[in-house]
């Protein structure tokens, strides 16, 4: 038998082996690194809500700020966003306070990390002018369209309770905003509780009976927020901080000069391209919301302060009402764990 130690390898084979070793060395960082390229991709859910951050989605500034590939998916309601997040398809999503409360009460481990807007006058119950409804009592026997498990659904049920109207005395239909507009035009519904751009369409042939701002003053505030899958967020803290900073910058641009966001502005065009509606309605729609600053977000006024934060208190109060209405069966022992100021605080340190 030949002595293998003395056997010479052909030069061609040696060259091939060297190329393989070089290739493996180049691949090693990708295999071993916890944040390789395929990890820098995320799916984010947004809704048909008129907000400054929609412009940041449209112009790509969020991708630029985070260096992530972002798959943007549009949903018509927070309940649908919650379902997508429960499936794992979506890691970050826009969700109202009511569907968020329902989701975490049912075991979904989400964290609210940004208040997209304080709803104020931006959601309202509108009644058809032809429905002969001039006061709340006139709603008896009427049909109301509303997206179930949404902030407007929550306020619809609270409004009926406040007015002393038994929900059995009205017909409440589960409809998404686009369906509400179509049903309104057909005359199938007498009233609806919804947000823009659908709300703007209904106002053209209807009048406002009550707004979310009115009901918030009675102790039932609502807001639109952005939530993240807790585990995913904790594993991508750098992305989360940069995402929050990009959203805050978009809000700041609007706050500094709202007059630049006119019906003929590039911003209005970008918003309507992303979520529909008409550019003429954008300026008024934006003015109906309040957009908390980055400092306000991190404070107890919204996300900071643990159980004493405004957001945690709102979730707790909403959960009690949802249970009373039999929309959820159990209450979480502590709603503050579903609220975090950490990413807002980190964003404040970025330039």
Where are these regions (language model features)?
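Cleavable N-terminal signal peptides
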Residues: 23-25, 35
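Secondary-structure end/capping motifs
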Residues: 234-327
């Amino acid at each position: 038998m030949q002595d293998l130690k003395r056997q010479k390898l052909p030069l061609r084979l040696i060259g091939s082996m060297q190329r393989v070793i070089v290739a493996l060395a180049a691949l090693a960082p990708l295999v071993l690194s916890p944040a390789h390229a395929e990890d820098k991709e995320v799916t984010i859910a947004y809704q048909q809500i008129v907000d400054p951050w929609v412009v940041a989605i449209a112009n790509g500034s969020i991708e630029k700020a985070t260096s992530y590939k972002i798959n943007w998916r549009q949903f018509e309601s927070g309940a649908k966003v919650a379902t997508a997040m429960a499936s794992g398809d979506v890691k970050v999503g826009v969700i109202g306070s009511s569907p968020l409360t329902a989701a975490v009460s049912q075991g979904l481990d989400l964290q609210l990390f940004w208040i997209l807007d304080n709803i104020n006058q931006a959601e309202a119950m509108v009644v058809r002018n032809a429905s002969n409804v001039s006061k709340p009592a006139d709603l008896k026997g009427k049909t109301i369209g509303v997206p179930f498990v949404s902030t407007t659904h929550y306020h619809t049920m609270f409004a009926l309770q406040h007015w002393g109207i038994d929900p059995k005395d009205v017909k409440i239909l589960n409809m998404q905003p686009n369906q509400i507009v179509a049903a309104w035009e057909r005359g199938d519904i007498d009233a609806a509780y919804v947000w823009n751009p659908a709300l703007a369409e209904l106002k053209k042939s209807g009048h406002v009976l009550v707004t979310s701002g009115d009901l918030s003053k009675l102790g039932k505030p609502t807001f639109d927020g952005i939530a993240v899958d807790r585990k995913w967020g904790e594993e991508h803290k750098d992305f989360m901080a940069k995402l929050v900073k990009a959203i805050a910058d978009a809000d700041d641009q609007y706050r500094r000069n709202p007059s630049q966001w006119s019906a003929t502005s590039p911003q209005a065009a970008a918003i309507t391209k992303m979520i529909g509606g008409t550019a003429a309605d954008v300026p008024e729609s934006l003015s109906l919301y309040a957009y908390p600053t980055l400092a306000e977000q991190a404070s107890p006024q919204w996300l900071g302060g643990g159980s004493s934060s405004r957001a945690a208190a709102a979730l707790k109060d909403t959960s009690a009402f949802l249970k009373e209405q039999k929309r959820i069966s159990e209450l979480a022992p502590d709603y503050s764990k579903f609220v975090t100021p950490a990413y807002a605080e980190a964003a404040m340190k970025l330039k």
